[in-house]
């Protein structure tokens, strides 16, 4: 199976959900074995940042990566699109310190990546395969990884809220099945908004880029895109957080009520317990996974 990149550069512009600033991000094709690379230009200096579990420096309400020179927050939705579409190599050039929130989902990122086109490269695809069971538990939060020939999620959330309640999603993630969660938006509670604003967070948050719930209902006029949009979005976040590994993961992941912090701690545990093996997919025949995806995704968008 061959590695992939995008066929042409694309630019996104939008508001940072926490900073409230207008931001630009440009994605560029990258050569084989580049992986996912962030670039931030400050003045005359170009800083490079490669995602990794140790590059995560904050997980409050979003995943933030950084080093001594730069920080980039809210990276998870864009990374979910890249990993969900199985794009191996890409350069992400960021103007600012945050990825724009767009509509609160991965819908726009996914759509534009598909419109740009996916290009196969000569090099063989490499993955990190789970080779033994690993379990991370912190309070009620739980993530368990098992060996599996693919990338499969079994995600459960449980809220004491009449609209959310108990939701479960089982998904064998491929570029096609990823479309079923790409449009699921981030969510929050009206009771928490005032405190977030006092703490300098959610400065760009609105009903245009998040589902907001009061004690009994969704207050967005258009309602939900799916009855289980909440667990779909949590699965989206998980995929984005797993992209902190330098290569795609392969395994079966059972997740209960996790969040960005726990996802990152889980990745550290996978590394600490030597539960991952580097696998080159030499024997896999490359098929055009993207041939029918764009028309299919357009059909999905038409239903929203």
Swiss-Prot record:
The lineage of its organism: Bacteria, Pseudomonadati, Thermodesulfobacteriota, Desulfovibrionia, Desulfovibrionales. PANTHER family: UDP-3-O-ACYL-N-ACETYLGLUCOSAMINE DEACETYLASE 1, MITOCHONDRIAL-RELATED. Gene3D superfamilies: lpxc deacetylase, domain 1 (3.30.230.20), lpxc deacetylase, domain 2 (3.30.1700.10). It comes from the Bacteria. GO terms for biological process: lipid A biosynthetic process. GO terms for molecular function: metal ion binding; UDP-3-O-acyl-N-acetylglucosamine deacetylase activity. HAMAP family: LpxC. Catalyzes the hydrolysis of UDP-3-O-myristoyl-N-acetylglucosamine to form UDP-3-O-myristoylglucosamine and acetate, the committed step in lipid A biosynthesis. Keywords: Hydrolase, Lipid A biosynthesis, Lipid biosynthesis, Lipid metabolism, Metal-binding, Zinc. Belongs to the LpxC family. The gene is lpxC. The keyword Lipid biosynthesis applies. Its cofactor is Zn(2+). It comes from Lawsonia intracellularis (strain PHE/MN1-00). This is UDP-3-O-acyl-N-acetylglucosamine deacetylase. The active site is at residue 260. GO terms for cellular component: membrane. Its EC number is 3.5.1.108. It catalyses: a UDP-3-O-[(3R)-3-hydroxyacyl]-N-acetyl-alpha-D-glucosamine + H2O = a UDP-3-O-[(3R)-3-hydroxyacyl]-alpha-D-glucosamine + acetate. Pathway: Glycolipid biosynthesis; lipid IV(A) biosynthesis; lipid IV(A) from (3R)-3-hydroxytetradecanoyl-[acyl-carrier-protein] and UDP-N-acetyl-alpha-D-glucosamine: step 2/6. Zn(2+) binds at residues 77, 233, 237. InterPro entries: Ribosomal_Su5_D2-typ_SF (IPR020568), UDP-acyl_GlcNac_deAcase (IPR004463), UDP-acyl_GlcNac_deAcase_C (IPR011334), UDP-acyl_N-AcGlcN_deAcase_N (IPR015870). Signal peptide: none annotated.
């Amino acid at each position: 199976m061959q590695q992939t990149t995008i066929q042409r550069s694309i630019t996104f512009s939008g508001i940072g959900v926490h900073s409230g600033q207008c931001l630009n991000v440009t994605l560029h094709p990258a050569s084989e074995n580049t992986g996912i690379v962030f670039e931030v230009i400050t003045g005359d200096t170009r800083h490079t940042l490669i995602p990794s579990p140790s590059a995560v420096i904050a997980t409050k309400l979003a995943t933030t990566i950084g080093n001594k020179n730069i920080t980039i927050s809210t990276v998870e939705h864009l990374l979910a699109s890249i990993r969900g579409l199985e794009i191996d190599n890409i350069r992400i050039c960021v103007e600012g310190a945050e990825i724009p929130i767009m509509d609160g989902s991965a819908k726009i990122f996914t759509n534009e990546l598909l419109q740009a086109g996916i290009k196969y490269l000569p090099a063989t695809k490499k993955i990190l395969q789970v080779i033994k069971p690993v379990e991370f538990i912190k309070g009620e939060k739980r993530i368990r990884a098992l060996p599996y020939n693919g990338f499969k999620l079994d995600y459960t959330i449980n809220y004491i809220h009449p609209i959310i309640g108990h939701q479960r999603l089982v998904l064998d993630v491929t570029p096609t099945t990823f479309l079923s969660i790409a449009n699921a938006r981030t969510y929050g509670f009206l009771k928490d908004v005032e405190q977030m604003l006092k703490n300098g967070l959610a400065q760009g948050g609105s009903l245009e880029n998040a589902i907001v719930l009061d004690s009994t209902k969704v207050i967005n006029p258009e309602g939900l895109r799916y009855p289980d949009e909440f667990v779909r979005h949590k699965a989206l976040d998980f995929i984005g957080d797993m992209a902190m590994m330098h290569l795609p993961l392969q395994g079966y992941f059972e997740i209960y009520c996790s969040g960005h912090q726990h996802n990152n701690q889980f990745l550290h545990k996978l590394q600490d317990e030597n539960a991952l093996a580097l696998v080159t997919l030499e024997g896999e025949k490359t098929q055009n996974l993207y041939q029918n995806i764009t028309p299919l995704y357009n059909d999905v968008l038409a239903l929203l």
